[in-house]
């Protein structure tokens, strides 16, 4: 369909944190309501891009009216489910909604400015999808510590691998951009190294369970390998399936150890 999101990797970024959160904490009414709001917001992305003119003037001219209807419907569902979730959640889980709300606002601002494909736009999307696991997990009665142990591995996986994939594209887009490629490579490797150190310290001090570190390792290693030795653009599809496998492994580790 014309209004379904075109970024196939984004489907996994939505599905894996939600499924893992339910696998760890169980299904709850509040968690389901948050999930409905998230999915509706996700489905609003493509029609919003058309309405904003991000898909070109022709798409806006030919599809603008129906895209506006689709967007309005998705936003109505998202708002209704969000309000119902706020009413259902306990105070702690209700406050945790601010965690995914912050990167979501940043993503919306990036879209309005036409920068959804920028590094910060894609990073905001990755963080928004991953951090939804926090309120969904807490909605079922789990602690903040457990909720972060679910969300952090996916936040690191999605953010670092998104940057790593950008390296592959930057090497060839428009004839290649060596400076941007090198900067993105350094950023990816630095984030991976710092994240490993910080999570390790937080587990030692008891702020996070050891499972958070174990579950984060596959994604950080994968991002570092891709950043250091990026594959040819022709292998992007294979890389995509590799990231699906790593996401699955991360989910299994989280469910088995948290």
Segments the model singles out, each with a brief description of its role:
Residues 1-90, 246:
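N-terminal topogenic module of multi-pass integral membrane proteins
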Residues 12-18, 74-80, 125-132, 185-200, ...:
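Core segments of transmembrane alpha-helices
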Residues 161-205:
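A mid-sequence, solvent-exposed acidic-amphipathic segment
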Residues 79-84, 92, 96-136:
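Intramembrane alpha-helical segments
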């Amino acid at each position: 369909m014309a209004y379904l999101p075109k970024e196939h990797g984004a489907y996994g970024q939505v599905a894996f944190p939600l499924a893992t959160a339910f696998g760890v904490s169980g299904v709850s009414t509040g968690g389901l309501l948050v999930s409905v709001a998230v999915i509706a917001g996700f489905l609003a992305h493509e029609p919003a891009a058309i309405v904003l003119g991000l898909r070109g003037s022709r798409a806006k001219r030919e599809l603008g009216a129906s895209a506006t209807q689709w967007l309005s419907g998705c936003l109505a569902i998202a708002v209704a489910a969000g309000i119902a979730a706020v009413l259902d959640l306990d105070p702690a889980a209700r406050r945790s909604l601010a965690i995914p709300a912050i990167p979501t606002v940043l993503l919306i601002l990036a879209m309005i400015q036409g920068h959804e494909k920028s590094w910060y736009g894609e990073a905001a999307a990755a963080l928004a999808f991953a951090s939804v696991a926090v309120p969904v997990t807490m909605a079922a009665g789990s602690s903040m510590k457990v909720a972060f142990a679910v969300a952090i591995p996916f936040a690191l996986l999605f953010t670092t691998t998104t940057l790593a994939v950008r390296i592959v594209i930057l090497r060839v887009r428009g004839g290649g951009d060596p400076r941007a490629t090198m900067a993105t490579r350094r950023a990816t490797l630095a984030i991976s190294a710092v994240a490993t150190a910080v999570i390790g310290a937080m587990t030692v001090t008891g702020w996070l369970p050891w499972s958070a570190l174990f579950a984060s390792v596959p994604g950080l290693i994968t991002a570092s390998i891709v950043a250091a030795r990026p594959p040819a653009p022709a292998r992007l599809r294979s890389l995509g399936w590799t990231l699906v496998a790593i996401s699955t492994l991360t989910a299994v580790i989280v469910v088995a150890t948290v």
